[in-house]
Amino acid sequence: MLSLSKNWNTLIKPNRVTYENFPETNNKAKIIVEPLERGFGLTLGNAMRRVLLSSLQGAAITSIKIPAIEHEFSSIPGVQEDVSEVILNIKGIEVKMHVSEKRIMKLKATGPCVVTAGMIDTGHDVEILNPNHVICNLAKNKQLEMELTCKVGKGYVLSTNSYEDNLPIGEIAIDALFNPVKSVTYKVENTRVGQVTDYDKLIIFVETNGDVLPEMAVGLAARILQEQLQLFIAFEEQEEDKQVKTDSLPFSPYLLKRVDELELSVRSANCLKNDNIIYIGDLVKRTESDMLRTPNFGRKSLNEIKEILAKFNLRFGMDVPDWPPENIQELSKRYEDSYN
């Protein structure tokens, strides 16, 4: 019976994740994942984007209370904007909460001034992430007082679906955008593994409001997907005793890996091929001097291969007992799960 694990173990697995922050801010990042099986870039990119934009926890202002104002179709004495405009501006305030319980913030201002989010008294548990965001314009000798309720949630919640069905008189519910991720885009490019050049490279661009860093947001999205997909694994995996298999060889099974599966430059790969170096075991038995005598093989190619071998605690000039084995092709196929 075909081993179930071959369904996923034979697929190439991503082994590089690179995070690149933009110099002007820590809230934007480019995340590069490679290599992926062809088609997996689009599959994972779309899934990650949808989760990032819909499912992460964040904080937002959910309601406001202004003295003598009972609904949004009113005007505030001394304030240039009407209540609807003020609410629209308040929806743009980005907040970060350090507790899970709701908090009430207070705003007091005396005109003439431009009232900004930075004027809100948040206390110790809430942080305003865009303090220069304009709320309204206040006329001379006029005062504005306001209470703002802040909560933790996820997604986008309409004021008509407020968490509290029975708000006190004078408290106005507003639409709340809890998601800390502001934008997500992705693209898929080709990447090279050995001599194969059409594997996928997934590049994700993420911007957050500062509540979480982009790399943390991506990690949370991946964890959410993992949790949701776990239920679909409705079979018991067969435990394979890889240790027994490995111990039956007098050398590391990694030496059975073909050199054309390494991420070598075209020049280096061609030199090895022309010199009939097929497996890593063939390669590590050569000394550095042997390699430099190979036609068209220079110091740059030597350093490239040394760097790759070092990742697996291998080097040139190794003594490999019983190499090459008589049934090397059969062994290479049998032990491929051990080195993939």
Curated annotation (Swiss-Prot):
GO terms for molecular function: DNA binding; DNA-directed RNA polymerase activity; protein dimerization activity. Its EC number is 2.7.7.6. Homodimer. The RNAP catalytic core consists of 2 alpha, 1 beta, 1 beta' and 1 omega subunit. When a sigma factor is associated with the core the holoenzyme is formed, which can initiate transcription. This is DNA-directed RNA polymerase subunit alpha. HAMAP family: RNApol_bact_RpoA. Residues 251-340 are annotated as: Alpha C-terminal domain (alpha-CTD). Belongs to the RNA polymerase alpha chain family. Residues 1-236 are annotated as: Alpha N-terminal domain (alpha-NTD). The N-terminal domain is essential for RNAP assembly and basal transcription, whereas the C-terminal domain is involved in interaction with transcriptional regulators and with upstream promoter elements. Keywords: DNA-directed RNA polymerase, Nucleotidyltransferase, Transcription, Transferase. GO terms for biological process: DNA-templated transcription. The keyword Nucleotidyltransferase applies. GO terms for cellular component: cytoplasm; DNA-directed RNA polymerase complex. It comes from Rickettsia typhi (strain ATCC VR-144 / Wilmington).
